[in-house]
A protein has these predicted regions:
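Extracellular/periplasmic metallocenter environments
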Residues: 131-143, 147-151, 159-229, 341-393
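Bacterial N-terminal signal peptides that target proteins for export
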Residues: 1-9
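Solvent-exposed, conformationally flexible loop/turn segments
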Residues: 123-125, 173-177, 238, 300-304, ...
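N-terminal, post-signal-peptide metal-ligating segments of extracellular/periplasmic oxidoreductases
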Residues: 21-169, 262-305, 377-383, 387-392
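Compositionally biased low-complexity segments at domain edges in trafficked proteins
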Residues: 233-268
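Long, repeat-rich segments with strong aromatic
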Residues: 298-319
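Bacterial N-terminal signal peptides
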Residues: 9-18
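Intrinsic, low-complexity N-terminal interaction/targeting segments
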Residues: 318-341
């Protein structure tokens, strides 16, 4: 039944993408809901295929400092290369304007996003407008959580009685462009008694599992009305970090056969449903990096820091629970002081921290199998007297 439902949704999305391809060249979604006055924040984002390396340094950068072969899964020894960590993926990447000629560089504060798509920011009362160009080889979409969307800007195909114009958002065909319009009402922002921001996600939803395992997921941060700087960041924070405790299962990505063919020659040699093969191609990452290979997360003693933490969905529910743990510091999560949180699939959490203990500290998943698989990184707390290295957000 599950496989049948997935096939049905994928087929509906493919039909929607094909039917609207000519009209999608630059189709602006019509936001039917009344919007409150505010800024229109426009993002030019392309879905693109490129290579991604989970271990760019070739070894552990957080614990041992050595190159290792932890990926030699029992049953796969001698057949699969434990050092093969570069895979073809799809990514959301931001451009400077509608020409899609110049990539918008990430600021030093946000280089740690890694594999994730660009951060979408807005203040309550604003409108987010995403111009999505599909440069990939198959249909993709963009579906947001939390913000307001009409049926023609949902980015998801299912039996909802919509047709024609209201289906063009469901799947953007290769080579086509579609504009999603998402108003940001008060219910998309922080609730009474919460902090200055709310945290949501966006992702492709043509086939949610395969799209996300391919790499198409990113963050949305909404700031309370009156609390945002010009760029949308909250005035009451010094640093923000987004961390995805994400299990990327390459055997469930659209590009698995192509990756196996490139790595090993004949894709028919390996059965993607074989347990050993699947486990070998699962990567326990933080923002797409293993073993501390991402940028160092740096803050100063006394900074007002907010962590936005989430986890990916995956077919293996037993692997979907993560327990991020900060060494050396404590944080406040949902009005409770702690140094660890628990996440279920696609769950988001925010943790407020005022670091008081300078040093280099471990940040990792406490599930033993995930920690052993490389789901850890480091963060640095500099003494309060150290000049800020990343002024602004």
């Amino acid at each position: 039944m599950r496989a049948h439902a997935r096939s049905m949704f994928t087929a509906l999305a493919l039909l929607a993408g094909a039917a609207g391809a000519s009209a999608q060249t630059h189709h602006a979604a019509r936001a039917r809901s009344a919007t409150t006055p505010g800024r229109v924040r426009v993002y030019y984002i392309a879905a693109e295929e490129s290579d991604w390396t989970y271990v760019p340094s070739g070894g552990d950068q957080a614990i041992t400092g050595k190159k290792d072969d932890y990926r030699n899964v029992p049953g796969a020894r001698g057949e699969l290369d434990p050092n093969a960590t570069t895979y073809r993926k799809a990514r959301f990447r931001e451009y400077t304007d509608s020409s899609f000629r110049t990539l918008k560089p990430r600021s030093p504060s946000w280089e740690h996003l890694g594999l994730l798509g660009p951060l979408l920011r807005a203040e309550v009362g604003d409108t987010i407008e995403v111009v999505l160009r599909n440069r990939a080889s198959r249909p993709y979409s963009m579906h947001p959580h939390g913000v307001l969307y009409a049926k023609n800007a949902e980015g998801t195909a299912y039996l909802d009685s919509t047709r024609d114009e209201d289906r063009r958002d469901d799947a953007v065909a290769p080579g086509a462009t579609f504009t999603y319009v998402w108003p940001v009402p008060e219910r998309a922002g922080p609730a009474a008694g919460d902090g200055s921001t709310a945290f949501w996600l966006y992702h492709s939803h043509v086939d949610e599992g395969r799209d996300i395992n391919a790499g198409l997921i990113g963050p949305i941060i909404i700031t309370r009305k009156g609390m945002a700087r010009a760029d949308g960041s909250p005035k009451d924070l010094d640093r923000e970090f987004v961390t995805d405790f994400g299990l990327f299962d390459e055997s469930l990505s659209w590009y698995f056969a192509a990756n196996v063919a490139r790595l090993y020659g004949d894709p028919s040699r390996f059965d993607s449903t074989d347990k050993a093969v699947r486990e070998f191609h699962q990567f326990f990452t933080i923002n797409g990096f293993l073993e501390g290979n991402g940028p160092m997360l740096t803050m100063r003693q006394g900074d007002r820091v907010r962590w936005y933490v989430f986890t990916n969905p995956n077919e293996q529910s037993a692997w979907d629970i993560h327990s991020p743990h900060w060494h050396g510091q404590t944080a406040v999560v949902a009005h409770m002081r702690t140094d660890m949180i628990m996440l279920t699939p696609m769950m988001t959490a925010m943790a407020d921290m005022i670091p008081d203990n300078p040093g280099i500290w471990l940040f990792h998943c406490h599930m033993p199998g995930h920690f052993g698989g490389g789901m850890y990184t480091r963060f640095t707390v500099l003494p309060a007297t150290t000049p800020a290295s990343h002024p602004g957000q």
